[in-house]
């Protein structure tokens, strides 16, 4: 599989993603947004950062880029697409996934390791885990609060499209374990089909043993 890691002006996690994927044996390379996606692309990561300085809303400007239209077209053809942090914001703004990511309830940038509970282990992104598994994955965001209206949230849950929820080390979903005030403590969801996903935590920062955590390997392993 050849994975394109899309870089916008302000992206800063693209090389991290490439290195993490390479560690898993995946052929990955950075694709500058103005150049479009390589013809042989059969996987896409939209990485973290601050595309276009987060002006208007985080991810709003990048979502209008022509390369995102290419990503949508590939997603429609069944190509796996993962948006991480700013990439998750872009994905929601572009309609690849439901909801939106807004300012943290704390109104602060938060950079820390958190725990995630696997809610659905039947997707490509979670097939390496079992339902209820607890992962330790870092976050680093100021606008990571997942928000969605009540009816859409009910549909999301009913359709089993929640991938991860923030939890404590024992797997309990509590207010204290929800770092940003996300609706339902949601940390990641799928699009209309489960080969498209967005998540706020950074699996690429929990893939290399040298980083002290490897729980993210199973997520990025969907591209392997």
UniProtKB/Swiss-Prot annotation:
Residue span, Glutamine amidotransferase type-1 domain: 2-224
Catalytic activity: N(2)-formyl-N(1)-(5-phospho-beta-D-ribosyl)glycinamide + L-glutamine + ATP + H2O = 2-formamido-N(1)-(5-O-phospho-beta-D-ribosyl)acetamidine + L-glutamate + ADP + phosphate + H(+); L-glutamine + H2O = L-glutamate + NH4(+)
Active-site positions on this chain: 85, 202, 204
SMART domains the record matches: GATase_5 (SM01211)
ATP-binding found in the keyword field: yes
Taxonomy, superkingdom: Archaea
Main localization category: cytoplasm
GO CC terms in record: cytoplasm
One GO biological process term: 'de novo' IMP biosynthetic process
Coiled-coil region list: none
This protein's pathway: Purine metabolism; IMP biosynthesis via de novo pathway; 5-amino-1-(5-phospho-D-ribosyl)imidazole from N(2)-formyl-N(1)-(5-phospho-D-ribosyl)glycinamide: step 1/2
Transmembrane helix listed as a keyword: no
Documented EC number(s): 6.3.5.3, 3.5.1.2
Short name of one Pfam family: GATase_5
Entry's localization field: Cytoplasm
Keywords noted in UniProt: ATP-binding, Cytoplasm, Glutamine amidotransferase, Hydrolase, Ligase, Nucleotide-binding, Purine biosynthesis
PROSITE patterns cross-referenced by the UniProt entry: GATASE_TYPE_1
Listed GO MF terms: ATP binding; glutaminase activity; phosphoribosylformylglycinamidine synthase activity
Assembly and binders: Part of the FGAM synthase complex composed of 1 PurL, 1 PurQ and 2 PurS subunits.
PANTHER family to which the protein is assigned, alphabetical: PHOSPHORIBOSYLFORMYLGLYCINAMIDINE SYNTHASE SUBUNIT PURQ
General function of this protein: Part of the phosphoribosylformylglycinamidine synthase complex involved in the purines biosynthetic pathway. Catalyzes the ATP-dependent conversion of formylglycinamide ribonucleotide (FGAR) and glutamine to yield formylglycinamidine ribonucleotide (FGAM) and glutamate. The FGAM synthase complex is composed of three subunits. PurQ produces an ammonia molecule by converting glutamine to glutamate. PurL transfers the ammonia molecule to FGAR to form FGAM in an ATP-dependent manner.
Protein's UniProt name: Phosphoribosylformylglycinamidine synthase subunit PurQ
Lineage: Archaea, Methanobacteriati, Methanobacteriota, Stenosarchaea group, Halobacteria
Primary gene name: purQ
